[in-house]
Amino acid sequence: MAQEQTKRGGGGGEDDDLTGSTAAGQERREKLTDETDDLLDEIDDVLEENAEDFVRAYVQKGGQ
């Protein structure tokens, strides 16, 4: 049984843009985290108010 390994080179020489994209990536990550937390809080509120209907609707839509 033979196995082949392929090595791929990176972008090469684009390290100067790394700090700018890292800061932008961090900002985007924080924004997405906040949005996700808000969405999860909203789901928690719905489940606290009416979990039975939520589960019933989920099962009717084909959930398992």
From Swiss-Prot:
Pathway: Protein degradation; proteasomal Pup-dependent pathway. Is modified by deamidation of its C-terminal glutamine to glutamate by the deamidase Dop, a prerequisite to the subsequent pupylation process. GO terms for biological process: modification-dependent protein catabolic process; proteasomal protein catabolic process; protein pupylation. GO terms for molecular function: proteasome binding; protein tag activity. Keywords: Coiled coil, Isopeptide bond, Ubl conjugation pathway. Residues 21-58 are annotated as: ARC ATPase binding. Residues 23-52 form a coiled coil. Transmembrane segments: none annotated. Residues 1-37 are annotated as: Disordered. The keyword Repeat does not apply. Disulfide bonds: none annotated. The modification Deamidated glutamine is found at residue 64. It comes from the Bacteria. There is a cross-link at residue 64 (Isoglutamyl lysine isopeptide (Gln-Lys) (interchain with K-? in acceptor proteins)). Pfam families: Pup. Protein modifier that is covalently attached to lysine residues of substrate proteins, thereby targeting them for proteasomal degradation. The tagging system is termed pupylation. The N-terminal unstructured half of Pup provides a signal required to initiate unfolding and degradation by the proteasome but is not needed for pupylation, while the C-terminal helical half of Pup interacts with ARC to target proteins to the proteasome. Strongly interacts with the proteasome-associated ATPase ARC through a hydrophobic interface; the interacting region of Pup lies in its C-terminal half. There is one Pup binding site per ARC hexamer ring. Belongs to the prokaryotic ubiquitin-like protein family. This is Prokaryotic ubiquitin-like protein Pup. It comes from Mycolicibacterium vanbaalenii (strain DSM 7251 / JCM 13017 / BCRC 16820 / KCTC 9966 / NRRL B-24157 / PYR-1).
